[in-house]
């Protein structure tokens, strides 16, 4: 008889994480203690590196698919910035913002070196701020659309699974944006139900790789 209790499923998930996150000996020798919460395991969530591994498996080699994936992710940063700024401020600010990012080492060095996965996490920051902005504006006008806030929570969860630095910068950006919108709209936006669902979405994503996400606070 299959035991589908929550405790049983949790134990199976933990066993899977241990087998998936355990560092090989040649990496553990140098990085074994980098994860303060769970030593000898990956210190970052495997989201970014797994995408490179999938690209290598599909491409059939180890070099070109990695750089191709980095190219796609670097381009994604430009695209998100352009469309978000264009929707808020128009074409000229959007094209100028994207053009400036092209010449930023934070964007082209991952493409050239294949490093710094946290830089790709910043592609989600404009989207996070945009969807929260849409939620605040629609809510303040009486047209409650919690889907915007749920998408914000989803993107925050994805963000922390790529790199925690971008996640904390996203939180700081949300705090500043909330204050500015509060002053502009002169309306306090708070809905316990919407916030509760959003927190649940975030926690589900946060707990996918607890060894790594809890390392943030270790």
Task: Tell where the protein language model's regions lie, with residue ranges.
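Membrane-embedded transmembrane-helix bundle of lipid-linked glycan/lipid transferases
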Residues: 1-218
